[in-house]
């Protein structure tokens, strides 16, 4: 505090709000010399003060941009914490803890981290963009089909895509349960699971494979005898619609 009867002079004056008062406000680093003069006897005294500066900003690193997927529905962002810094993230929606260096997020957006150096109050900011890829693949197990005596196996499914993997269940009755279009030879309900390699998203579809191997009825009729009076006979039984008939040998038949 100023003493009555004394005058005050600070040097240099640069960086001071008033170089001629006892307690000026300083805003620049440097070595300041104070000269105090007694107005009555003209005696002087001097003293110095060193004003240093610490305005080093902390490092703010929100980390690289990332993508949420079905395989990775949550991600950690940011980088390792530095002692003496505080961390504040925004927005906070979808975030595990907005006041740590490396929170976990579940929502796609652009997140900004503000890092404050507790020692000097300096702050820095950085941002990271989180996108999302949860587009499911297409699963097509194909149309329901029926195994028969003439069609004992056939292909199911649809043409595959190199960006997907394929898995059929059950595997029994299939030549390869990891193909997009396996060959089936046994009746069952087959479930196809298609997984997108890039995002891990899955889609399923089913196909019903039935079997019809019921044989038709073959009835050649009762044994008969050709005679002089019965030189020909009708053999067999009445035809059934949908059946075809073949006799061997053909010699002697109309």
What are these regions (language model features)?
Residues 1-254:
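Proline- and Ser/Thr-rich low-complexity, intrinsically disordered segments
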